[in-house]
Amino acid sequence: MTTMLTTPLSGWSQLSLSFLTLTVGALALIVVLYISIDRFPAPRWLSKKYQLIGQKDPASTTSLECPYSYIRQIYGHYHWAPFVHKLSPTLQYDDPAKYKMVLEIMDAIHLCLMLVDDISDGSDFRKGRPAAHRIYGPSETANRAYLRVTQILNQTTSGFPHLAPWLMRDLENILEGQDLSLVWRRDGLKNFPTAPLERAAAYQRMASLKTGSLFRLLGHLVLEDRSMDDTMTLVAWYSQLQNDCKNVYSTEYAKMKGAIAEDLSNGELSYPIVLAMNAPDGHWVDLALQSPSPWNVRNALRVIRSDKVHQMCMAEMAESSSSIQDWLALWGRKEKLDLKSV
């Protein structure tokens, strides 16, 4: 009978075996960490982008002393002027004081809403520039927005009292729509309809309040009647659709915002997101809204950017824009919606 002899491993072999064991263990740990990180939302303070944008000294980023002046510089003064000219071509000459007041009101309401929106959304950029609250801080930015809106309300009441009721009513509707959107974000989907048609209708009603009221306000201020409500509502709905779609479909928009699918990561509903909930694999969208981990967001984006959802969004944009092309030419926003399934 042959006896098997075993010899102890040499020192080099033992070292190699130990190194191999450590390497395998380290790789396993990396895989576990990656899977864990990929499945859970990362704290915003871990983002290098989040750390770099904020400035302790606003003067190092802009010479403008307040958030409102800063965002107004980005968009330009009186950016609603083309719409006013279309609604009333001679207002600038017939009543220059009212003409200027209408433009001041529209700038103040629109831009101040964006200041607060960017805080709510945690946005880092606005049109490729640092968002105002990332320069001046959330508290000063929000307070300046409230201050400017209060100033414009007082100026309207004292100087143009016949315009004040229109402004107050439409501003209330805008904020009601914004509040509804924020409640959905806070509560998740438990208070949102489940049937596809009901979901789309609920979202469109919110958009009509939040965005539609802003556009209708312009018609109310210029014409002092409701004769353009239907047209302004349609222009507003297209604007909302365009904004929603570019958030998930536009490479250009993602570069300017410094984020892809910001609405989804923030747990905020948009038209493509609402449609995707009822698409095949729509449960990924629900999961991403509840827990926006990289894994959930990637899978949700795959559904949102699917051919079916993309085609439904493009069809709605085409239908809503068919009768308002002259108004959309004034709006002038044409981001290329080129992102597809991932």
From Swiss-Prot:
Transmembrane segments: 17-37
GO annotation, cellular component aspect: membrane
Keyword list, A-Z: Glycoprotein, Magnesium, Membrane, Metal-binding, Transferase, Transmembrane, Transmembrane helix
Site residues (Important for determining product chain length), renumbered to this chain: Y146
Matches recorded under InterPro entries: Isoprenoid_synthase_dom_sf, Polyprenyl_synt
EC number from the UniProt entry: 2.5.1.-
Binding site for isopentenyl diphosphate: H110
Binding residues for dimethylallyl diphosphate: R126, K210, T211, Q240, N247, K257
Positions bound to Mg(2+) 1: D117, D121
Binding annotation for Mg(2+) 2: D117, D121
Enzyme superclass (EC): transferase
Record's bilayer topology term: Single-pass membrane protein
Pathway: Secondary metabolite biosynthesis
Chain positions carrying an annotated carbohydrate: N154
Role description: Prenyl transferase; part of the gene cluster that mediates the biosynthesis of the indole diterpenes penitrems. The geranylgeranyl diphosphate (GGPP) synthase ptmG catalyzes the first step in penitrem biosynthesis via conversion of farnesyl pyrophosphate and isopentyl pyrophosphate into geranylgeranyl pyrophosphate (GGPP). Condensation of indole-3-glycerol phosphate with GGPP by the prenyl transferase ptmC then forms 3-geranylgeranylindole (3-GGI).
Family membership: Belongs to the FPP/GGPP synthase family.
Protein name in UniProt: Prenyl transferase ptmC
Name of the gene: ptmC
